[in-house]
Amino acid sequence: MRWSGDVAIITGRYASVGDSTVMELWARARSSESVLLRVHGVKPWFEITPNGRWDESRDVDLDQVSSLEEVREIEGPEMKWTDLGVKPVWKVFVGQPFMVPKTRQELAGSWTILSGDIPFVNRFFLDGDLSMHVSVEGEVVDSDHPVDICLEITMEDARHCEPFPAPFKIFSFDLETSIAHDTILCAAAVIEDMGTGERTRHTFDGDEESILRELTQLVRNNDPDIITGYNIDNFDMGRISDRANLLSKRDKSLKIATMGWGRVSTSEEGRRRDTLYPTRGTARAWNLGGRCVMDAWWQARQALRPQRETLKFVSNLLFPDDEEMQKMDVDASKMDEEWAARPDVVIEYCLRDAELPLDIMHKIQAFRRKEAVAAVAKVPLDTSANGTTSQLIDSLVIRMADRTAIGVPLTGSADKKESQIEGGYVHDVEAGLHRWVAILDFKSMYPSIMIGKNICYTTRIDESSTDQPGADEQEYESPTGAKFRNESGRRGMVPTLLEDLMAQRDVHKAGMRDAEDESIQSYHDQMQYAVKILMNSFYGVFASGFYRFTHRQLGESITAWARQNIKSIIQKLGDEGQHVVYSDTDSIFVKTPVEGVENPYDTMIEFGHSTAERFSEASAELEFETGLSVFFSHGAKKRYVG
């Protein structure tokens, strides 16, 4: 039997089957079924190129490479751009993904390695130019993994589909534990179907083994996509793992029954990640095969930056007038006494603490926003929720590099930064009281500079490279002395991607304005927010010292041009007799000339708009952000009221 439909991919891994490799991607269908995609035919590979600059007269001997036990095939060469100029690049196929690091190590020193540290599952998204939302068609097969549908497909059976709000199933839980003995006293879980909005509530007490068995059975029976709770990364997941391991000792069946939360077969053995049991390693977030662990504490911390990060504080911050959405009055520091005196109240308290994380996640729109970021960055949900910013940027940049014959260097291969990059310009604040202050902001300051000055790893002019601009090509020279190719000679990957993201955001903003349906408006809002997040992440990643497509001159040049722009405008305003009372990185605070004016409010607004328009340039567009009738500061930077 065949099945086709749209799915949202949550997470993935690979499995070795004989001599071949199968990708396993877990997803939730638009029609609500849980789906496992088993993708066949994708071969693991990396690329090599000779060390140093390329000279046509050089001989290349591939015997060392082809003689390696792990190597199955070599393709090429294809001429690709590298930081040392255009060079021949060979694609080396190996038997299994886990063989790539060993083969890289054996070739290190003799060859320059490219595309050698890209997780194998990412190849589904990169090679197919796919995102988390895809349309698939394949043969339905039986599977030991606990899913509604298992499909056997190839890359040709998957194609892009427009993003849609996936009907995820969410499992939110909480534990109450003994302070004296570390044992689990009770547990609670709330399961939500985001397709229907329905919730079911469950509580557990009794002996510890029974609690863990029933909680695990609830997970496996309800097949959630996302596991959440408050501070589960630092407490609840670890406590389940510790207690289940202590109880089960070497009894595998008991271990499965008490902590087998993964969306994988209970007969599976030998994996260290993406497995049946919760694992963590050195990462912040926990890892489960087929599910995304998404801590509400971490999401609230990122979204709200609250003064305190406790569940009580965050709940009160978000729901100050709703008594049903506050923590109950139970003293967690005396949990043993509370449990002995009023167990029913503690169970109710536990259930409340299991449900509040769901309410918080919806209030801060964490589920839909992470889904939107995944859709824009073209990664699985789990990468959006728990991955790094560089992983999101990698997804966009690497696929463009692959399609434009640009070699992909290894992470950490860039020159190390010798010191911190000088940041944005901060104009000393003038102490005192100032009336009618117009605030001007640079629109997307760093992205605009990167576009306007064509700043990219691929456009930086390096004397050590064989790839140099033509004699008549104009160059962009930054205040630091670094030089970049003109777009007439080479358009950078980063400016191209940023322009594309800006265009996407304009489309979604227009969609928000034109939407007559609240759900459509919400969709466009989430998407434009996700695009904004990604655009603003580019500078931080490319100015870092660890990213693969970077050089210290990139970040230095961006901030230098930004400082030059803002200082130039401040000087011109001063020459005109205007009074700048403060500026900080991408904002300028200008006092409006209102002497003898009847309506200073209207004058300030008109002054703000006209000043922004006068000083806007292609790579430095100013906007009138707002105005202050009164601005006061005691003279300290970043400290003012208005």
Where do the model's predicted regions map?
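Active-site palm subdomain of RNA-directed nucleic acid polymerases
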Residues: 323, 565-585
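N-terminal accessory regions of nucleic-acid-interacting proteins
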Residues: 72, 83-165
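Catalytic nucleotidyl-transfer cores of nucleotide-processing enzymes
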Residues: 116, 123-136, 283, 296, ...
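Conserved RNase H-like, two-metal-ion catalytic cores of nucleic-acid enzymes
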Residues: 1-69, 144-228, 247
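A short acidic-Thr-Gly-centered motif at the start of a beta-strand
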Residues: 157-166, 220, 422-436, 571-573
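Common nucleic-acid-contacting/processivity interface regions adjacent to the catalytic cores
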Residues: 3, 18-20, 132, 333-453, ...
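C-terminal polymerase-core module
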Residues: 591-642
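Active-site-proximal helix-loop-helix substrate-binding element of RNase H-like nuclease domains
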Residues: 199-203, 223, 227, 237, ...
